[in-house]
Amino acid sequence: MNKKLLVDVRPFEISRQKIDESIKENNGKLVVKGVLQRAESKNQNGRIYPREVLLREVGKYLDTNVQERRALGELDHPESSVVNLNNASHNVVEMHWDGDDLLGTVEVLSTPAGNILKELFKSGIKLGISSRGLGSVEPVNEKNGEDGTVEVQPDFELIAFDFVSNPSTHGAFMRPVNESVQNKTPENNIERIINSIMRG
């Protein structure tokens, strides 16, 4: 099996009132909560994440990244399997399961990318939360394999959760859930160029 970068997006919405309350209650920091990932459910990219694979990876992520306050994520789709500290915008501070939904609490950082993320939220922009990992997929035999459904394999490794502008799953706004595969598309190139200009 050939491992590739897998990116799965869920919409993440938060009201202006909730943003203001969060900033007030958290000493000026924006802290948001919602769905980070969903197990055993086909996303808009046609991928299904088996619960046992996500349980294992989330457990490792909690024990290392979250507990050590290094569960950093980036703003937009990175083209790398590592988190670039120059682009860090937020830190996942807590995660837990509610059935097949992985819920989490995310602190927006006071970094250049974090400040952009905070202003996007304050302006009412809908963003997606995106899981990033390395792994392989295998076709699932639904409708004779014609629908393109694939299942993420046990070699999956969770890398990070990133905020993105193009959620590919219904409800992936840190309340609902969404996902997508990392492909070099014209949309990704345009977003990368715009972000490069914004970051200077």
For every predicted segment, state its role:
Residues 53-67, 89-95, 120-121:
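A broad, low-specificity signal for short, low-complexity segments enriched in glycine/proline
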Residues 60-83, 129:
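Short conserved beta-strand and strand-loop elements enriched in small hydrophobics
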Residues 36-42, 76-79, 132-138:
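Short, flexible beta-strand-to-coil junctions
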Residues 8-11, 15, 23, 31-34, ...:
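Residue microenvironments linked to proteolytic maturation
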Residues 84-88:
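Extracellular-facing segments of soluble proteins and assemblies that are Gly/Ser/Thr-biased and enriched
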Residues 1-64, 182-192, 199:
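Polar/acidic, low-complexity leader/linker segments enriched in S/T/G and N/D
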Residues 48, 81-82, 149-150:
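Short, solvent-exposed loop/turn motifs
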